[in-house]
């Protein structure tokens, strides 16, 4: 507050994004990537089992859905998913855009975007998900080093339970699972029939067939 409104205030603004949902705060990951946390994205964890690599980028309470999707993918589809916590999609987009602008002005190749740096060592498709519109996740598409599928709450709203709304917008764990399988199908790693069966069995078109993020154990 002092930096924003004090006598020697600076041209900056601090804000807090608050989600209307009670969740357990996960424990701090071992060897936390503090730079990544501050700049917009860090690797949270990778599933212990599975042979097909894939990646889930999630923000806010979407991280819980990503972790639940990670469990389903490992247990039912032999997918070893890495989960990334995105602390700021906008910062990542601004970083990439600033590098592109600097390169244009100098007539040189752009330096590597921070998002690319964080993701380039991970194999498989990438799925980006948040409770906001997909436009938010789409901002970093140029900097994702692989096939990228985005899930978000596009539309005019949906009045129901949190779980029902996430199923309606397809931002819940089950929808993430199918999006990851879709990415793997595009890479030829799984058959199209696997994706179709998963979408059908997980009832992605039924907002009443849902489970809760509260089912996720504290990590």
Indicate where each model-derived feature is located.
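Thiamine diphosphate
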Residues: 1-219
């Amino acid at each position: 507050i002092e930096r924003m409104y004090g006598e020697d205030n600076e041209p900056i603004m601090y804000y807090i994004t608050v989600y209307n949902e009670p969740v357990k705060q996960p424990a701090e990951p071992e060897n936390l990537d503090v730079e990544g946390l501050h700049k917009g994205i860090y690797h949270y964890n990778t599933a212990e089992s599975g042979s097909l690599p894939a990646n889930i980028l999630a923000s806010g309470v979407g991280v819980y859905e990503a972790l639940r999707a990670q469990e389903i993918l490992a247990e039912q589809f032999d997918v070893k998913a890495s989960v990334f916590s995105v602390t700021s999609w906008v910062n990542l987009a601004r970083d990439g855009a600033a590098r592109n602008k600097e390169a244009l002005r100098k007539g040189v190749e752009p330096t590597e975007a921070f998002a690319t740096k964080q993701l380039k060592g991970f194999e498989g498709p990438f799925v980006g998900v948040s409770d906001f519109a997909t436009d938010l996740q789409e901002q970093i598409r140029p900097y994702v080093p692989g096939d990228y599928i985005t899930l978000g709450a596009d539309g005019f709203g949906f009045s129901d339970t949190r779980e029902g709304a996430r199923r309606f917008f397809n931002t819940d764990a089950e929808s993430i699972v199918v999006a990851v399988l879709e990415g793997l199908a595009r890479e030829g790693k799984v058959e199209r029939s696997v994706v179709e069966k998963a979408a059908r069995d997980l009832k992605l078109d039924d907002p009443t067939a849902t489970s809760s993020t509260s089912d996720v154990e504290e990590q």
